[in-house]
């Protein structure tokens, strides 16, 4: 009996030890002496910020747990000043998250390479993005290595380079952003969804086999998607509220905060006004909305007089909400085709005028105009958010003053007899009745 109890105790101990061991021995938490910690605390602040925005920390932790890595870090001014503004804006758009990740992984090798290994012969090494970097004469892809062995750690090394390395796939994605080949017969997709609890990308569901019952309910399939844009707002729905407008409004406000640069807009929608609740109610009723969101720099230019009047924040925001579903492509195609477009706004009866200017969409008139420069921040088929660089105000019509002059009094002319009748009456006297 004692042998049996010892055997059972040994089995239970073995099972508990097995379950306590991690599945991947190299996927534990990194220590303070890791090359990733050195990168985040280094003077390469622009690169570290891009790594955090691209949600690559978890991926790099797993890579460091398996092998050493080599990071080629561009200088801060190469990312801040010497980079094309349009290309940088393209990388920071949520829908281009994959391109940003590929660009950053192109700077990382899954092995340790020190400066003595930079030979004069041409050598190629595979990166974490499955592309190749070519080394020759102290250069990597024709970019000079300015600070070799700048930061050295047990699990990796960081070399400083003079400029950003751009893989061909990312360059092609950037060049196709306005070509017909990238937008013809292609269903627009929303930005990648990020789980707010873990700050990681939500995984796409597995493909549904043929004949399987639908995963989404019918009312989700009924909602008009981006392929129908531009489309007028549908009529109000019934009392069942098939569309969860409050959840969609929360998603787009969370996207504004995560995108960065639109905190003032989100603060007005949630805290200063009740517009977020009103928008959620409209979407629940079946309406679609397009929000022209001014960035923080534009909101900072508002004066105290413009915001101090009762209801001023609501009226300003109402003018930036269009009761239609419009994407950047649909707006740009409309103004290219028709010249000027006047969109209805929730600030009735004022309309928002749009026209094509400098390869983009321009809203408003004169000094109060604004350009669309952050396209498709959030597009889910019912709410579309487009970033603009100014706050719009409706055009004030100046009343035409009527000229007031001295009224001219017209006197009625007295009836006058003809000259011939006067002469005849004078000669013959006033005997005839006509001379009376």
UniProtKB/Swiss-Prot annotation:
Main location (coarse class): secreted
Glycosites: 68, 271
Cellular localisation: Secreted
The FAS1 domain, residue ranges: 31-165, 249-392
Keywords, A to Z, come to: Glycoprotein, Proteoglycan, Repeat, Secreted, Signal
Q: Which Pfam families match?
A: Fasciclin
Q: Name one GO cellular component term.
A: extracellular region
- SMART domains, sorted: FAS1
Q: Where is the signal peptide?
A: 1-20
Task: Tell me which family the UniProt entry assigns to this protein.
Answer: Belongs to the fasciclin-like AGP family.
General function of this protein:
May be a cell surface adhesion protein.
Stated name of the protein: Fasciclin-like arabinogalactan protein 15
Q: What is the lineage of its organism?
A: Eukaryota, Viridiplantae, Streptophyta, Embryophyta, Tracheophyta
Annotated gene:
FLA15
